[in-house]
Regions:
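Active-site-proximal substrate-binding core of FAD-dependent oxidoreductases
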Residues: 33, 193, 351-354, 385-418
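Conserved N-terminal/central alpha/beta ligand/cofactor-binding core
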Residues: 15-123, 134, 146-163, 170-175, ...
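An anion/pyrophosphate-binding glycine-rich loop and adjacent beta-alpha core
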Residues: 30-32, 48, 75, 176-315, ...
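A glycine-rich dinucleotide-binding beta-alpha-beta segment and adjacent secondary-structure elements
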Residues: 301-367, 395-408, 526-580, 585
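Core beta-strand elements of the Rossmann-like FAD/NAD(P) dinucleotide-binding domain
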Residues: 133-142
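Extended, charge-enriched "interface" segments that sit outside catalytic cores
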Residues: 425, 431, 437, 442-604, ...
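Beta1/beta-strand and adjacent pyrophosphate-binding region of the FAD-binding site
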Residues: 1-9
Length: 614
């Protein structure tokens, strides 16, 4: 099988396919762009950090790469509930690329080619191979498209534009035409990136410092990482001001977005600075996070300040910001427009309904973000390889993972703008925490051939430790005097009486370290595992309620819909429901119920019809 593209999606797709034993080739326009970070030099964040943990639990590469190349680590949302805790790290952009390139080079059964793919070979509705710019022809049973923003890429800075992918890469225009000819429903999306500036031109004394978490609190992304972690750099925060906003508004028509040059739809949850100023006119300031791009470079990334305004305007509005008065722009901000597919034309396996054997991943599927891309890449590569090998493919239901939620949203609801994973998109987020991704997904990764012996042994060892400690906490009793002394020492009002450790941990003010101070730490229990156990105990009632809801939803998921089912014959359905059900062709009643425009009464009518049909 073949993977087109070696960005975050392509890396995971190629690695997964080769790990499964499929003879695999990955094609990239440049070996120097493998694992490139064309936007922010970071991994993780709210919901995204959970995706990385899930990817790692399934046997992916991103978590290991982030642990090996991080500069600073922070756990976001620590003041909120565990469902939204999110690990985020600053990474060394160059070292991340080198790690990923080497990881692919070391993957058995994987061939790497520097070549532009200009066409697909399709015969009788099934992919047969690819053609490169140098007229190379390669046959394959399955192909994964992981094209990022290169597909029909067009860069905009003010009224200037040129055909290009990110970071000066070539635009893949010929491949776009080949995909259109094959009948894939393409659309135009847009994203953007801020300027990169020289460290020496920033007055850090006028900015807010944003340090990482204390070293003794740092957690890795990968369940395989045991090495101690240490923060290496600080990040900083600057703020726009009314003068910044005036400069932007005075020049807003020079923005290709507002001047009508850009037709692609931009990301709703990652707007440009000009979008922020226009849409949030009542705000006096917006934060800009100043982040290093690496240890051996002076480039700094200005997160929150992407723009497509002309260079002279960029210079003016950046220099109006306190601490940026002498700013030197090394790379100007730009917007990039690109082609992607309507994801409702994909199966839940990420295989195209139009061209069989063709899979999509990442921004090609209408998503934004490295983490979303990587997670889809693993699933697409896994399923393409299993398809090529004649094995059953993997579909992850929503309740199993954020990855399952993401894919279900894409193929069932579709997207109107670049899709970003958020905790609010999951109705099961209390059970889909980042700390238990291994329990949820590593057995699945093992069953489907991705999880190797070393990871499986580590997983089983961790599960044994957790289970032993659950039993100990269930049985251990804390005497009243011991508990009162521990609570007094912790500055808490002493409890009236002692009790079973597990029951005591249900109280919001009592934490594992306090209990362990009395009965001792469990064998093999780390602070990370202790926090996980405490979360399970404190939220047991809510988790049980979600489990019941999952079982109820699973009933709908088991009600399958025949592929040739005629929705047009069901006069009880609304016209909108009939049209959308016919176009999307849901696999089961559960998926049908999540299609926008399909009402509960439509689902009830469909359920009756399916019962009669069987």
């Amino acid at each position: 099988m073949i993977v087109i593209g070696a960005g975050h999606a392509g890396i995971e797709a190629a690695h997964a396919a080769a790990t499964l034993g499929a003879k695999t080739a990955v094609f990239t326009m440049s070996l120097d762009a493998i694992g490139n970070m064309p936007c922010n030099p970071s991994i993780g964040g709210t919901a995204k950090g959970t995706l990385v943990r899930e990817l790692d639990a399934l046997g992916g590469v991103m978590g290991l790469a982030a642990d090996a190349t991080y500069l600073q680590s922070r756990m976001l949302n620590k003041g909120k509930g565990p469902a939204v805790h999110a690990l985020r790290v600053q990474t060394d952009r160059k070292r991340y690329h080198e790690y990923m390139k080497h990881a692919l080079e070391l993957t058995p059964g994987l061939a790497i080619h520097q070549a532009e793919v200009v066409g697909l070979e399709v015969e009788n509705g099934r992919v047969k191979g690819i053609v490169t710019q140098l007229n190379g022809e390669y046959t394959a049973k399955c192909v994964v498209l992981a094209t990022g923003t290169n597909l029909g890429g067009k860069i905009f800075v003010g009224d200037a534009w040129y055909a290009s992918g990110p970071d000066g890469m070539h635009a893949a225009n010929a491949l776009t035409e080949s995909l259109k000819a094959a009948g894939l429903p393409l659309r135009r999306f847009k994203t953007g990136t801020p300027a990169r500036v020289h460290r020496r031109s920033i007055d850090f004394s006028r900015l807010e410092c944003q340090p990482g978490d204390p070293d003794n609190e740092l957690q890795p992304f990968s369940f395989m990482t045991d090495a101690p972690m240490h923060n290496k750099v600080e990040c900083w925060i600057a703020y726009t001001n009314p003068e910044t906003h005036k400069i932007i508004l005075d020049n807003i028509q020079r923005s290709p977005l507002y001047g009508g040059m850009i037709e692609g739809v931009g990301p709703r949850y990652c707007p440009s600075i000009e979008d922020k100023v226009v849409r949030f006119a009542g705000k006096d300031r917006h934060p800009i996070f100043v982040e290093p791009c690496g240890e051996n470079t002076e480039e700094m990334y200005l997160q929150g300040a992407s723009s497509s305004l002309p260079e002279d305007v960029q210079n003016a509005f950046y220099r109006s910001i306190k601490g940026f008065e002498q700013i030197e722009i090394l790379r100007p901000a730009y917007a990039i427009e690109y082609d992607c597919v309507d994801p409702t034309s994909l199966e839940a396996t990420l295989e195209s309904k139009v061209v069989r054997g063709l899979y999509g991943a990442g921004q090609f599927n209408g998503t934004s973000g490295y983490e979303e891309a990587a997670a889809q890449g693993l699933l697409a590569g896994l399923n393409a390889a299993r398809n090529a090998l004649g094995k059953e493919q993997l579909i992850l239901p929503r309740h199993t993972s954020y990855l399952g939620t993401l894919v279900d949203d894409l193929v069932t609801k579709g997207v109107m703008d670049p899709y970003r994973m958020m905790t609010s998109r999951s109705e099961y987020r209390l059970t889909l925490r980042q700390d238990n991704a291994d329990t949820r997904l590593t057995p699945i990764g093992r069953e489907y051939g991705l999880v190797q012996d070393d990871r499986w042994a580590k997983y089983q060892h961790t599960q044994n430790i957790l289970e032993a400690e659950r039993r100990r906490l269930h049985d251990a009793h804390l005497r009243t005097a011991d508990l009162q002394a521990a609570m007094t020492a912790a500055g808490l009002a002493p409890a009236a009486e002692g009790g079973i450790a597990e029951e005591l941990l249900r109280r919001p003010e009592i934490h594992y370290d306090l209990v362990a101070g009395v009965i001792g730490w469990g064998e093999g229990i780390t602070p990370m595992l202790a926090e996980r156990l405490e979360t399970e105990i404190k939220y047991a009632g809510y988790i049980a309620r979600q489990d019941r809801m999952i079982r109820e939803v699973a009933r709908h998921e088991k009600t399958l819909i025949p592929e040739d089912f005629e929705y047009a014959d069901l006069t009880g359905l609304t016209l909108e429901a009939r049209e959308k059900l016919t176009r999307i062709r849901p696999k089961n009643l559960g998926q049908a119920s999540r299609i926008p425009g399909v009402s509960p009464s439509d689902v009830a009518q469909l359920s009756i019809a399916l019962a009669a049909h069987t």
